[in-house]
Amino acid sequence: MEKAIRNFLSQESAGGILLLVAVALAMLMANSPLAGLYQGFLGTEVQVRVGALDLHKPLLLWINDGLMALFFLLIGLEVKRELLEGALSSVAQASLPTFAAIGGMLVPAGIYLLFNYGDPVTQAGWAIPAATDIAFALGIMALLGSRVPVALKVFLLALAIIDDLGVIVIIALFYSTDLSTISLIIASIAIVGLVALNRKGVTALAPYGVLGLVLWVAVLKSGVHATLAGVIIAFCIPLRAKDGSSPSEHLEHSLHPWSTFLILPVFAFANAGVALGNMSLNTLISPVPVGIALGLMLGKPIGVMLFSYAAVKLRLAQLPNGIGWKQIAPVAAMCGIGFTMSMFIASLAFEQADPMYGDLARLGTLIGSIIAALIGYFWLSKVLPKQGV
């Protein structure tokens, strides 16, 4: 298990560097003479027509609705594996990261709402600081190599996965609008078909892919966010076949490099370009960016630590063997790396609002995530032994 986790984290480390490059490139283009080219490229209309079906969207929405559906497919596969066989497969293993994740979502959301109380437009962004970027957080931890105990890596992985599950629920409940009954019926039929394939023991991925595409289009047209289709597909793909092979893990391993080295960097490049030229100091310290940045920098670690400590003291959970609070605390700080997940929620929260709010949300996310990453990295580096364990 240790070797598998280290291989996974080494890939995430390289992906984290690529994410930083994508963000830097986006910021450079958005604040240079290339800004018009950058915005024009993302606004390019892309049309797909098959018979009566006509999908016509800007490139940015194809990235956010299409590529990110594949990312959520991967997240769904990871969640299912961990729930059935991994770090979340027993109550004892799942208790501490579950309480930590709940605290790490509630407190940041509360801080954001505190700064944005009374403004119905900006209050829609309450979930932005509640997210953790699993790829980036694990990538930062991976920079410390073998100095990090495996139990600590598993704790962060489990916490981040539960956090992702919470984000999925939030998107389904709070960011779905103008529902289409016909599209939901078609989506339901596709889901029934996927479940039937699972119950019949079908392990070939092609049938799931065909029905999954139907489901994605139906969900896209339904008013429910299309990324949820990826999660549903993931939960329907069998974890184990009769011969002991794992179709789910095979697909997960196939998707990982695409997600790490293409999907997330492209998403970051498309969404991280914030034009700073028209922003005044008053704008930069307005409730949206401040609420998000403080939610990530302070709310995340406070929430994770508070709920974890309470759960242990109430004997609802226990610390992993060989791990103390001095190791948990910097990991809690790393959970404030919202980055791509926070930007994704921001794109949903302010989709119908003035574009300025989206820019402010992305700026707050960048500031909060970068500071959380630096604090988490240097703090964890200080408390860990100098040599590998």
UniProtKB/Swiss-Prot annotation:
It is found in: Cell inner membrane. It catalyses: Na(+)(in) + 2 H(+)(out) = Na(+)(out) + 2 H(+)(in). Coiled coil: none annotated. The keyword Methyltransferase does not apply. Gene3D superfamilies: Na+/H+ antiporter like domain (1.20.1530.10). GO terms for molecular function: sodium:proton antiporter activity. One of its GO terms (biological process) is regulation of pH. It comes from the Bacteria. This is Na(+)/H(+) antiporter NhaA. It comes from Shewanella sp. (strain MR-7).
